[in-house]
Amino acid sequence: MSYDRAITVFSPDGHLFQVEYAQEAVKKGSTAVGVRGKDIVVLGVEKKSVAKLQDERTVRKICALDDNVCMAFAGLTADARIVINRARVECQSHRLTVEDPVTVEYITRYIASLKQRYTQSNGRRPFGISALIVGFDFDGTPRLYQTDPSGTYHAWKANAIGRGAKSVREFLEKNYTDDAIETDDLTIKLVIKALLEVVQSGGKNIELAVMRRDQPLKILNPEEIEKYVAEIEKEKEENEKKKQKKAS
């Protein structure tokens, strides 16, 4: 029997191959990074080069789900569109029903449950996306969650998904400290530094979104990103000079 054809059939050694193939699709997607700061959450995504005549505003990997929640994804864009639309409807339905916005965990659990249903149903296939979901709960607490095609979800301080996830996660494990997220600017710089581990040609290939407590989602423009990249480069040069002085 071909165990990789049927979604709902386990192989003898306990694998659901279609779910694993969906996870492989995520690994081929653009790298996305999320970091939870003290009063800010930041999402950064590697921008693929677009065709010369294409409007790059239509190629977005970061989107708002509600006033207090947004997400970035890696994987199949068409699959992500379905998940995003369903999540937005759920956010609106929740607001109409209980007259409060969703918590970040609530909408993450909804997205994870939707993905899980598609791993257990005939005539469907798993969603080929992983998502980083960030936002603020009504008490002002910043949150960061990650979901994968199998329907599992976890809370994180910082995480990465997509093709460069392994090296970016290693960078974050070494560099994520309380001092590194002391201010909003430092948190933004940490995300950019993490992305520069895998992104070529600096800030022009980075898409960045920030959300501060009680403020709407803000997508940074290329000039703002370049300013941060220039500051990071300057800091690197100064650190190199200090090292050389110590060595001599």
Swiss-Prot record:
Residue intervals passing through the bilayer: none
For whether the record's keyword set contains Phosphoprotein, the answer is: yes
What keywords does the record list, in alphabetical order?
Acetylation, Cytoplasm, Glycoprotein, Nucleus, Phosphoprotein, Proteasome
Q: Which InterPro entries match?
A: Ntn_hydrolases_N (IPR029055), Proteasome_alpha (IPR050115), Proteasome_alpha-type (IPR023332), Proteasome_asu_N (IPR000426), Proteasome_sua/b (IPR001353)
Keyword Heme annotated:
no
**Compartments, record wording:** Cytoplasm; Nucleus
**Could you give a GO molecular-function term held by this entry?**
identical protein binding
Q: What induces it?
A: Up-regulated in liver tumor tissues.
Would you tell me the Gene Ontology cellular component terms?
cytosol; nucleoplasm; proteasome core complex; proteasome core complex, alpha-subunit complex
GO term, biological process aspect, one: ubiquitin-dependent protein catabolic process
Gene3D superfamilies given in the database record? Glutamine Phosphoribosylpyrophosphate, subunit 1, domain 1 (3.60.20.10)
Phosphotyrosine sites (modified residues): 153
Query: Where does the UniProt entry place glycosylation sites?
Result: 130
Where is it made, tissue-wise? Detected in liver (at protein level).
List residues, modification N6-acetyllysine: 227
Q: How is it modified after translation?
A: Phosphorylation by ABL1 or ABL2 leads to an inhibition of proteasomal activity and cell cycle transition blocks.
Give a Pfam family name: Proteasome
Report the protein's function: Component of the 20S core proteasome complex involved in the proteolytic degradation of most intracellular proteins. This complex plays numerous essential roles within the cell by associating with different regulatory particles. Associated with two 19S regulatory particles, forms the 26S proteasome and thus participates in the ATP-dependent degradation of ubiquitinated proteins.
What family is it from? Belongs to the peptidase T1A family.
The protein, known as: Proteasome subunit alpha type-7
Q: Which organism is it from?
A: Mus musculus
Q: What is the lineage of its organism?
A: Eukaryota, Metazoa, Chordata, Craniata, Vertebrata
Q: Which gene encodes it?
A: Psma7
